[in-house]
Amino acid sequence: MEVTRPMSKQEERALEALPPSAKFVYKILEYEAPLTQKEIIEETQLTQRTVYNALQDLEKIDVIDSHPLRTDLRQDVYYLK
């Protein structure tokens, strides 16, 4: 489990306003990050589009970050800020 910075009140409110799927992806990343999009899909059993949208929503409110996977630069790994 990765150590993350505490969430600001503004980030908490923004997260609360997101769809349940984005909150679910956030929780998965909270406990199992870093993960690729494919690994998140496998963990959550959500569709690829739903996970993609959830990751976009989480990036918009600036609570997750990503970088290319070292072994496959076509994929990104996602983790909490």
Show the residue positions of the predicted features.
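Glycine-centered, phosphate/nucleic-acid-interacting loop/turn motifs that mediate DNA/RNA or nucleotide
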Residues: D62
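Hydrophobic residues on short alpha-helical segments
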Residues: A22-L29
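Short acidic, hydrophobic short linear motifs in intrinsically disordered regions
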Residues: P34-E43
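Short helix-capping/turn signature of helix-turn-helix
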Residues: Y31-E32, L46
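Short amphipathic alpha-helical interaction segments
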Residues: T47-E59
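Short, cationic-aromatic polyanion-contact patches
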Residues: K9-A22, T36, H67-K81
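Residues within the helices of the helix-turn-helix
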Residues: K27, K38, Q56
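Linker/hinge segments immediately adjacent to helix-turn-helix/homeobox DNA-binding domains
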Residues: M1-E11
